[in-house]
Amino acid sequence: MGEQPIFSTRAHVFQIDPNTKKNWVPTSKHAVTVSYFYDSTRNVYRIISLDGSKAIINSTITPNMTFTKTSQKFGQWADSRANTVYGLGFSSEHHLSKFAEKFQEFKEAARLAKEKSQEKMELTSTPSQESAGGDLQSPLTPESINGTDDERTPDVTQNSEPRAEPTQNALPFPHSAGDRTQALSHASSAISKHWEAELATLKGNNAKLTAALLESTANVKQWKQQLAAYQEEAERLHKRVTELECVSSQANAVHSHKTELNQTVQELEETLKVKEEEIERLKQEIDNARELQEQRDSLTQKLQEVEIRNKDLEGQLSDLEQRLEKSQNEQEAFRSNLKTLLEILDGKIFELTELRDNLAKLLECS
């Protein structure tokens, strides 16, 4: 459930005003992740963007789509199926160009796939069927976009690397104020970088999780509808069997028909059992997704606690810097006083030396 994104970037998302068809209406309050996905169920490629649990872009790429750069950091494309025009505002021209290149790459692959499908239709269809089958589109494949499966493997598995847990070992207490300041600064920076990386990974997993939840919910609804239809068909067949059993003049025909109907009912019951197992599996996946959501909330709480602790460490760092500056000023004053005292002492020693010499001369004269 839930394919990995082939390419992702961040941008502000807009849609054209459905009333005026001129003004842009923002659909996200801040920059969100916009990703290309391969839908293996329908064999198509999509552009999907989520704002929390809300899908603000769900556009299927077709050969007739065109991505237009309207400025250095803004581009747009029209989706006739969604009956709207999407706009993306990027942080730099480089990100816009990269997104446009990927769009053109998928569009070209869709066009080539369509041409191959039409060639096959011309070889296997009659002339009348050829004129009627010109608009058919062939589903896209991963190989037509990225060449081989090996080329796309790094993009799929890049988020599966294990994350390193933060170390909890206590730091040795420094002997001087400068060492304590440096130790606190390093500890604060390391903790902040770790949780920033953790939050970025968490956001990426949250986007994948939301997409999987949306797909699971849609599949559950579809299975429930099919289950209800199978149940109605089974009830109708049971009623038909009962009616046929009541007709005694057609006993042989009824028996044969009954056997066929019972076989059909048995097949339907087996199908229902398979669908029920599928629904249970989907429910289990939804429960797992909820557990991941709870883990995300727990990590978010830990991140907030670390941010509070980081602020406390910054306050302690500022206080230590002030104390260090005060200590340096006091040492400078002490050195100045000591220098003055040494100069006075040198003068006194010089005077005593002269006095000693004078006394010695007096003793020699006497």
Curated annotation (Swiss-Prot):
Keyword list, A-Z: Acetylation, Cell projection, Coiled coil, Cytoplasm, Phosphoprotein, Synapse
Positions of modified residues (Phosphoserine): 318
UniProt cross-references to Pfam families, sorted A to Z: WH1 (PF00568)
Region (Required for tetramerization): 302-366
Region: Disordered, residue numbers: 114-189
Composition bias type Polar residues, residue spans: 138-147, 155-170
GO biological process terms, semicolon-separated: behavioral response to cocaine; G protein-coupled glutamate receptor signaling pathway; positive regulation of calcium ion transport; protein tetramerization; regulation of calcium ion import; regulation of dendritic spine maintenance; regulation of store-operated calcium entry; regulation of synaptic transmission, glutamatergic
Cellular component GO terms, alphabetical: apical part of cell; axon; costamere; cytoplasm; dendritic spine; glutamatergic synapse; membrane; neuron projection
Coiled coil: 193-364
Domain WH1: 2-110
Quaternary state and interactors: Tetramer; this tetrameric structure is critical for forming the high-order complex with SHANK1, which in turn is necessary for the structural and functional integrity of dendritic spines. Isoform 1, isoform 2 and isoform 3 encode a coiled-coil structure that mediates homo- and heteromultimerization. Interacts with GRM1, GRM5, ITPR1, DNM3, RYR1, RYR2 and SHANK3. Interacts with IFT57 and OPHN1. Interacts with SHANK1; forms high-order polymerized complex with a mesh-like network structure, at least composed of SHANK1, HOMER1 and DLGAP1; the complex formation is SHANK1 multimerization dependent.
Free-text note regarding domains: The WH1 domain interacts with the PPXXF motif in GRM1, GRM5, RYR1, RYR2, ITPR1, SHANK 1 and SHANK3. The coiled-Coil domain forms an antiparallel tetrameric arrangement.
Protein name as it appears in the record: Homer protein homolog 1
Organism from which the protein derives: Mus musculus (Mouse)
Gene that this polypeptide is encoded by: Homer1
